[in-house]
Regions:
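Oxyanion-binding "anion nests"
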Residues: 226, 236-270
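Peripheral (often C-terminal) accessory segments that flank ATP-dependent C-N-forming ligase machineries
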Residues: 306-391
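Conserved metal-phosphate-binding beta-hairpin within the catalytic cores
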Residues: 215, 260-295
């Protein structure tokens, strides 16, 4: 919606039943098939002939990287496709780095960015050695995961061993089936069948508050940025539901350095920890795609869709009217479904897309399906009542 408002004509490749399909923000959608993802994306590109690609989740970015490799192997026949992907995401040299947690952190450290100690863990000996050198607690993270699913905070050696085995293991077929049936997302089916294993990384635990940035950039230059401190989350390792807009010079400097070093274009997220004792900002990872705040238009320098439109068209950026003067942003439907009585729903800016009532219903319906799967009957009932009252 924000991209369309900025001037873009929006087409999308997405699974059947995706919430985007109930909005008026797109011109056309093209089917995404979880068992034939690259063919789906390539067909969408061929039909839409886009000027820019914006991946909206980690899997989409990885598959664009794979499609880029396939296109380059075709020589001249694939040149238009790989050039479009590089134009949209940035230098191809960045592709192997943005999904490799340890090399990314090592690169950030070389750029003078403050980072926690991080190392790749391939076996039990590596894990024991890490604990002996760095100590506990620690954070274990798997490459190839997203949305907090591949993150574990461990406080004992036993927890570390258990988490390592869990994170390294291929996704369970039952989890893939759940994703396919409830979320209409078939992306875990193939990895679970192939028994693909993830690489695990250990990261030093920073005592502090989570923070996050989203950057619009072009050819290694930051065009616009949003920096937030995380106030509430769906769960300890889940997405944020309440954010506070902040100005943080260290976060801004870190993102500028990494965007320049990697030669990035498009939208990219960066996650930080703000250390309690010092306030220092530690860069902990990159999200090489847009995040759930990409649509927020918060004035000059903080309107990412307008900045990207200007970069693509060569025009001067025309930021939209500032969404709110409040610095507390309450994300929908996350906080509403986390706690329907949350005081932030009234005190902050509750970012509900009221202009698209079908999208509001779709967001709440997705929560209801997930609640039924996990038997969260009480929460499901309270949210259902709230949604009927307002819609």
């Amino acid at each position: 919606m924000a991209l369309a408002n900025a001037g873009f004509t929006v087409d999308a490749v997405c699974p059947s039943g995706h919430p985007l399909m109930v909005t008026g923000a797109h011109r056309r959608t093209y089917p995404y098939h979880g068992l034939r993802p690259l063919a789906s994306i390539e067909a969408g590109i061929a039909a839409a002939k886009p000027d820019l690609l914006i991946p909206c989740d980690d899997l989409a970015t990885r598959q664009l990287h794979q499609l880029h490799e396939r296109a380059r192997s075709r020589g001249a026949a694939g040149s238009a496709t790989w050039a479009l992907i590089e134009r949209s995401l940035g230098a191809r040299e960045s592709f192997p780095v943005v999904y490799a947690r340890t090399p990314f952190i090592e690169m950030a450290q070389a750029e003078g960015v403050r980072v926690p100690k991080t190392a790749s863990i391939t076996n039990r000996n590596d894990l024991d050695g890490w604990i002996a050198r760095v100590g506990l607690p620690a954070v274990l993270k798997s490459n190839g995961s997203s949305g907090g699913e591949g993150v574990r905070v461990v406080r004992t050696a036993g927890e570390a061993v258990s988490a390592f085995r869990s994170l390294q293991a291929p996704p369970q077929l039952a989890r893939g089936v759940k994703r396919a049936l409830v979320d209409r997302d078939k992306t875990l089916i193939l990895p679970s069948i192939l028994r693909s294993r993830w690489e695990v990384n250990a990261q030093e635990f920073v005592v502090g508050r989570e923070a996050t940035s989203l950057i619009a950039c072009w050819n290694g230059t930051v065009l616009a940025s949003l920096h937030f401190e995380v106030i509430h989350k769906v769960s300890s390792s889940g997405p944020a539901t309440v954010l506070r807009l902040v100005e943080n010079a260290e976060m801004a400097s870190a993102t500028q350095k990494m965007v320049r070093r990697l030669g990035l274009s498009g939208m990219h997220g960066f996650d930080f920890m703000l250390e309690d004792s010092t306030g220092n900002a530690y860069l902990i990872e990159i999200n090489p795609r847009t995040t759930q705040v990409g649509h927020l238009t918060l004035g000059p320098g903080r309107d990412l869709p307008a900045a990207l439109y200007a970069a693509v068209t060569g025009q001067t950026a025309q930021p939209a009217t500032k969404l709110t003067e409040k610095d507390i942003i309450v994300l929908f439907p996350g906080e509403w479904t986390r706690n329907p009585e949350s005081t932030f729903l009234r005190s902050g800016h509750h970012d509900v897309p009221w202009e698209e009532p079908n999208l509001v219903r779709a967001g709440l319906e997705k929560h209801r399906k997930q609640s039924r799967w996990y038997s969260h009957r009480k929460l499901d009932k309270s949210v259902s009542t709230a949604s009927v009252r307002h819609l």
